[in-house]
Amino acid sequence: MRIEKSAPLLLSTLMIAVMLLSGCTEPEAKQVPTREGAIPPDAAKSTPETDANPPEVHSNEFRDPVPLPYPVNTAGAEDSPFILPDGDILYFFFTPDVRVPPEKQLLDGVTGIYISTKRNGLWSTPERIILQDPGRLALDGCEFVRGNVMWFCSAREGYTGVNLFTAMFEDGRWRDWHYAGDTLNKEYQVGEMHISVDGSKLYFHSSRAGGKGQLDIWVSEKMDGEWQTPQNVESVNSPENEGWPFITDDGGELWFTRTYKGTPSIFRSRRIGDEWSFPELIVSSFAGEPTLDGEGNLYFVHHFFRDGIMREADIYVAYHVSQNTAYHSISRLFAQMMKFHTKI
């Protein structure tokens, strides 16, 4: 999978980890740090007030984006969000320090997929989801959850490259992880993906041959239990990068990330009959990986850059204008509070 300079943090981390796993031995035994404890003391929390390139909304359907409050966002890097339809369960990728090279992130004991739940309007302390056997290396991310099945990408021992895996939620935890097969991983070259609510269509990005640009969005239909040869979603692709697709549960909207004026931005295409409409810009300026809850609230990752260098990443939300503004106001309050902290 080709990785562009502006691609999300997670994938660049995974790709370098691939080169390391083939020669890695068992990691040295050490005390596993906490997520917050792994954030370096000199990490300064970025805030909307200090952001040189804040995300900008281009649609009157959404309010101005705000960062999710602590304990979801920290002075580390929160990336690759996935929100469930009820809006109360959030999955995301975390690494404590974007300055640390991937070969060290692989061994830090905290980089990986996390989950946070919202109760009474407040997000819980995120917990890491372990998707590998004890003593074996893996760097997991780009999670997608449907029911009791999680799809995720991983660079791990015993496999070459970044591959898709699945896991099952049973007895209160994720288990029974399996390689998703050569058809998806090798033949179709599936990257980050989203499956329609009826399970019949798999949308994904890939640099596979036959596309319009660098990364393109493709769709594969399931027939007789098998994923068919992918088709290019031509109406949304361009010579630029298009990827990180999200399909609304009604199947009527395709959300994705595209390079716009040199930075990742969020676009939407609507289903009209059997075709996807010309994409419209929704959020620009280092915004990507859109994911929506059932009320139409838009969650995404925002990367903070200063002097051309990435400093941090946070999960943001742009509330739909039809939604209650109470939690929106709480998020703004937390954002104001966080500017006084150099480290959470």
Regions found by a protein language model. Give the residues of each.
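C-terminal motif of bacterial Sec signal peptides marking the signal peptidase cleavage site
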Residues: 21-23
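Short, conserved micro-motifs composed of acidic
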Residues: 28-344
